[in-house]
UniProtKB/Swiss-Prot annotation:
GO cellular component annotations of the record: extracellular region
Residues bearing the modification Isoleucine amide: 21
The family this protein is said to belong to: Belongs to the frog skin active peptide (FSAP) family. Ocellatin subfamily.
Location in or out of the cell: Secreted
Keywords: Amidation, Amphibian defense peptide, Antibiotic, Antimicrobial, Cytolysis, Hemolysis, Secreted
Tissues where this protein is expressed: Expressed by the skin dorsal glands.
A Gene Ontology BP annotation from the UniProt entry: killing of cells of another organism
Name of the molecule in the record: Ocellatin-4
Described function: Has hemolytic activity against human erythrocytes (HC50=14.3 uM). Has antibacterial activity against the Gram-positive bacterium S.aureus ATCC 25923 (MIC=64 uM) and the Gram-negative bacterium E.coli ATCC 25922 (MIC=64 uM).
Length: 21
């Protein structure tokens, strides 16, 4: 669903932020 898509994108962005720190 759309919520799953948004959650997936959010997790991807969060993972990228963790890698940058």
């Amino acid at each position: 669903g759309l919520l799953d898509f948004v959650t997936g994108v959010g997790k991807d962005i969060f993972a990228q932020l963790i890698k940058q720190i």
